Every structure is written in C-alpha cells, then in structure tokens.
A protein has these predicted regions:
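Solvent-exposed, non-transmembrane regions of membrane-associated and secreted proteins
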Residues: 23-144, 150-221
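Hydrophobic H-region at the start of alpha-helical membrane spans
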Residues: 11-22
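Terminal targeting segments of Actinobacterial cell-envelope proteins
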Residues: 1-13
Length: 221
C-alpha cells in the first residue's frame, strides 16, 4: 500500500478505467495491508457475515439524490467519528489508495466514482488501525441497520444516509460487485470500507473486509 499522495494525473487515468478494473483495485487494496502488525481485529463469522441486520428494523424511504458536490467531512454519531474526507485515486499497483498511515484519522473518498449524495454508489475507505493505535474505522463493524452516517459537502448541504447493511466478507470468497455495485438503481448510496477479520502475520494482511452499505434518506444544512 502506498503512502504517497495520488498525482494530479490520477483523475484523468481513473476516468478511463472500467468498472471491473475499479472493483479489482478495491479488492487489491484490502489485500495489501502489510504495514499493520497489531492484531486488532473486527468480528467475522463465515464467508459473508451479516453483522448489522437487527430483526424487524423498519428503514425510512430513500430521498431524492442531490447534485454533485465534494465531500468535506464524515460524521458517524453512533461511533463517535468526525473525520475529514480527502479525495483519493489509485496507487502504482492499481489499488485504491487510502490516506497514508500518518493520517489514519482521515477518510478517503474514491474521486473517480460517485459523489456522496448524488446518484450512484459513493465509495469511502479508511484504516482500521496502525502499528500503534486504532484508526478512524476501527469500530466500523459495530454499526447497525438504521443508524446514521452524515457527509458534509462543499455546497453547504449535509447528506444524511441510513445504514441498511453491514457485511464482513472473507477475502477467499469476495463478491466485489455485490460489495461495491449500486444496490438499487436511481438511489444515492454510500459504501464505507475497511479491513476486518483477523490479522494474518504470515501473509501480512487481514482476512476479511468490513463493508457498510447506506442510502440517502435526508438532507440538512
């Protein structure tokens, strides 16, 4: 995983990438966590564990998508997360490039995809930990269906998302399209992605990915 900032030419390169290449890059990112040595792990049970689906949870209807605007901050009240958001591209290996480890409390937004609040599935990534401490998405797997994620945008609006699914997916049987594709056409959706499972010292990577799916249900100022 590269700690370098993506170059100014990355945006032009990313616009030419196919959706399949993006999915592969996201999968590669999860496999390349080699600098984290602590065994700070998120829960995982099975190949694709649904950890955020309380029974009989009634979710609100989807709101109309907003126009395009850049994300500036993400708030997850139930986790106590208030983090700046920075645009990211792909690294030299073609994997999505998260913020560097010295900015482990920052969330990266994939700038080649949808913008949070606009139609499509916007992708955000963050570290689960560093060598020495938990990072911004350390508690991500504890989110539950019905809880709220807010993205503050540069147009002054707050895109309010409701969590509808939390998955811990084994890397051995990873369904990239299910994880990152839009679940319902026409909706504004959000994916929050980090490492999960346990840290395998031999391979230098985590055994799973935590993927939170949410959709736009309101706006604020």
């Amino acid at each position: 995983m590269s700690d370098d900032e993506h170059s100014s030419g990355s945006g032009r390169l990313l616009m030419g990438l196919t959706w399949a290449v993006l999915l592969l890059a996201l999968w590669q990112w999860g496999r390349q966590v080699t600098e984290v040595r602590q065994d700070l792990s998120a829960p995982a049970t099975g190949d694709m564990a649904a950890v955020g689906r309380p029974p009989d949870t009634e979710l609100p209807p989807a709101a109309r998508p907003l126009g395009n605007a850049l994300p500036q901050r993400i708030d997850i009240p139930d986790l106590g997360v208030r983090a700046p958001v920075v645009p990211r591209g792909l690294d030299r290996q073609g994997a999505i490039d998260p913020p560097p480890f010295d900015r482990a409390d920052t969330v990266g937004w994939y700038a080649g995809g949808a913008r949070p609040g606009a139609a499509g599935a916007a992708l955000m990534v963050g570290h689960v930990d560093t060598e020495t401490r938990p990072a911004v998405f350390y508690k991500l797997s504890s989110l539950r269906s019905g809880e709220t994620v807010r993205v503050i945008r540069d147009d002054g609006r707050v895109a309010e998302f409701t969590v509808d699914d939390v998955q811990v997916q084994s890397r051995d049987r990873f369904d990239a399209r299910q994880a990152y594709g839009q679940h319902r056409p026409g909706r504004a959706e959000l994916r929050l992605i980090t490492c999960g499972g346990t840290f395998d010292q031999d391979s230098g990577s985590y055994t799973a990915n935590v993927i939170v799916s949410a959709y736009l249900t309101g706006t604020g100022h």
